[in-house]
């Protein structure tokens, strides 16, 4: 996921619900890789319960009713779904901006041209090391790095912009500058770093999760590093970056405006249930792909109704529902903490962000 600039349009729907800016749609869970951090624990074989072409198109028909969302076609690897370009073309014809997050290994010149023709605006490719040895070890398949680099070349040839996504782990922290240099060299338009969420296969990567203090260091480094390049840099699943950005900007006497910080000045950290949602391969709507919280199924309830009325989404939209230090925190509206990490580390999706070291000025809830 993550292949997206921020969507545009009004902030609320006619009933007062927030507009949905982004939908990550897991059009298939099948994948040809075996990544150590995969939230879906995906495998090659087809999964039962995936949508037919007609069902998928009927779902697409409902998306404009929640705003003008960007649709992220994700997986698994979305390229393992045979009708994916037909679905993208259908969504594009509806006026929806479509982006895609393949792993890159399956992209051929023909696939890249079909992406372009169907309306794919951007691809995100995950690269977790600056070379084959480090990336392939994380991705679980020898040759994955070389295949992804080749696929990226085909995207370039087809005129499709791409971004690189990198998951932060203890093993690759020391390689971040080299990964960025790789992004520059291959022509990426953006580099998004993802803080590891311990779900799916990543639940077994406890030794790779860095501490709250280390995350603070990484995100401060990221804040400084973004000043050195014109490439768009974004911290994802790292809502506390938006606190750090404001703290640092205040220290430097810089206003947090789009002119100074781009779209980072206009969005918040965790968008789950407030501007973003995830739809699984079987139709379950979730706040995000890392938080398997059942907010309703589009096979039983129209998607716009789920977006507007889900009790879980209502919680995420109400500051008083947050417990621990996230509720009273003065940075709540721009951060919100990672709900998936809260759930996976405490069992409570409304608990405080476990990998944040900040202590709010007050610790009593806002009532």
UniProtKB/Swiss-Prot annotation:
<keyword id="KW-0411">Iron-sulfur</keyword>
<keyword id="KW-0350">Heme biosynthesis</keyword>
<feature type="domain" description="Radical SAM core">
    <location>
        <begin position="15"/>
        <end position="238"/>
    </location>
</feature>
<dbReference type="InterPro" id="IPR050377">
    <property type="entry name" value="Radical_SAM_PqqE_MftC-like"/>
</dbReference>
<dbReference type="GO" id="GO:0046872">
    <property type="term" value="F:metal ion binding"/>
</dbReference>
<dbReference type="Pfam" id="PF13186">
    <property type="entry name" value="SPASM"/>
</dbReference>
<dbReference type="GO" id="GO:0016491">
    <property type="term" value="F:oxidoreductase activity"/>
</dbReference>
<dbReference type="InterPro" id="IPR017200">
    <property type="entry name" value="PqqE-like"/>
</dbReference>
<protein>
    <recommendedName>
        <fullName>AdoMet-dependent heme synthase</fullName>
        <ecNumber>1.3.98.6</ecNumber>
    </recommendedName>
</protein>
<dbReference type="Pfam" id="PF13353">
    <property type="entry name" value="Fer4_12"/>
</dbReference>
<dbReference type="InterPro" id="IPR030896">
    <property type="entry name" value="rSAM_AhbD_hemeb"/>
</dbReference>
<comment type="similarity">
    <text>Belongs to the radical SAM superfamily.</text>
</comment>
<feature type="binding site">
    <location>
        <position position="31"/>
    </location>
    <ligand>
        <name>[4Fe-4S] cluster</name>
    </ligand>
</feature>
<dbReference type="InterPro" id="IPR006638">
    <property type="entry name" value="Elp3/MiaA/NifB-like_rSAM"/>
</dbReference>
<dbReference type="GO" id="GO:0051539">
    <property type="term" value="F:4 iron, 4 sulfur cluster binding"/>
</dbReference>
<dbReference type="GO" id="GO:0006783">
    <property type="term" value="P:heme biosynthetic process"/>
</dbReference>
<keyword id="KW-0408">Iron</keyword>
<comment type="function">
    <text>Involved in siroheme-dependent heme b biosynthesis. Catalyzes the conversion of Fe-coproporphyrin III into heme by the oxidative decarboxylation of two propionate side chains.</text>
</comment>
<keyword id="KW-0479">Metal-binding</keyword>
<feature type="binding site">
    <location>
        <position position="35"/>
    </location>
    <ligand>
        <name>[4Fe-4S] cluster</name>
    </ligand>
</feature>
<feature type="binding site">
    <location>
        <position position="38"/>
    </location>
    <ligand>
        <name>[4Fe-4S] cluster</name>
    </ligand>
</feature>
<comment type="pathway">
    <text>Porphyrin-containing compound metabolism; protoheme biosynthesis.</text>
</comment>
<keyword id="KW-0560">Oxidoreductase</keyword>
<keyword id="KW-0949">S-adenosyl-L-methionine</keyword>
<dbReference type="InterPro" id="IPR034391">
    <property type="entry name" value="Cmo-like_SPASM_containing"/>
</dbReference>
<dbReference type="InterPro" id="IPR013785">
    <property type="entry name" value="Aldolase_TIM"/>
</dbReference>
<keyword id="KW-0004">4Fe-4S</keyword>
<dbReference type="InterPro" id="IPR023885">
    <property type="entry name" value="4Fe4S-binding_SPASM_dom"/>
</dbReference>
<dbReference type="Pfam" id="PF04055">
    <property type="entry name" value="Radical_SAM"/>
</dbReference>
<dbReference type="InterPro" id="IPR007197">
    <property type="entry name" value="rSAM"/>
</dbReference>
């Amino acid at each position: 996921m993550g292949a997206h600039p921020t969507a545009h349009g009004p902030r609320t729907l006619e009933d007062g619900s927030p507009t949905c800016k982004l939908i990550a749609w897991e059009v298939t869970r099948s994948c040809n890789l075996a990544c150590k951090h995969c939230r879906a624990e995906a495998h090659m074989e087809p999964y039962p319960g995936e949508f037919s072409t007609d069902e998928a198109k009927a779902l697409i028909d409902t998306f404009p009713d929640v705003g003008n969302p960007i649709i992220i076609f994700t997986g698994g690897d979305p390229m393992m779904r045979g009708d994916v370009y037909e679905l993208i073309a259908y969504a594009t014809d509806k006026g929806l901006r479509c982006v895609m997050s393949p792993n890159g290994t399956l992209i051929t010149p023909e696939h890249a041209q079909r992406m372009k023709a169907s309306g794919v605006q951007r691809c995100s490719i995950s690269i977790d090391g600056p070379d084959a040895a480090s990336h392939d070890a994380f991705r679980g398949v020898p040759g994955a790095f070389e295949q992804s680099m080749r696929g990226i070349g085909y995207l370039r040839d087809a005129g499709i912009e791409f971004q690189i996504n990198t998951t932060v782990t203890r093993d690759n922290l020391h390689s971040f500058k080299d990964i960025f240099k790789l992004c520059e060299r291959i022509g990426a338009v953006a580099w998004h770093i993802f803080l590891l969420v311990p779900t799916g296969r990543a639940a077994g990567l406890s030794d790779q999760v860095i501490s709250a203090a280390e995350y603070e260091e990484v995100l401060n480094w990221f804040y400084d590093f973004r000043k050195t390049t014109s490439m768009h840099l974004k911290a994802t699943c790292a809502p506390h970056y938006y606190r750090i950005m404001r703290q640092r900007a205040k220290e430097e006497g810089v206003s947090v405006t789009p002119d100074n910080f781009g779209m980072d000045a206009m969005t918040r950290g965790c968008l789950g249930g407030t501007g973003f949602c995830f739809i699984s391969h079987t139709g379950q709507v979730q706040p995000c792909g890392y938080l398997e919280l059942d907010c309703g199924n589009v096979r039983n309830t129209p998607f716009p109704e789920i977006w507007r009325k889900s009790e879980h989404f209502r919680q995420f939209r109400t500051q008083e529902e947050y417990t621990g230090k996230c509720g009273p925190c003065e940075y709540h509206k721009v951060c919100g903490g990672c709900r998936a990490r809260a759930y996976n580390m405490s069992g409570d999706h409304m608990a405080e962000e476990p990998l944040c070291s900040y202590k709010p000025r007050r610790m009593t809830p806002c009532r």
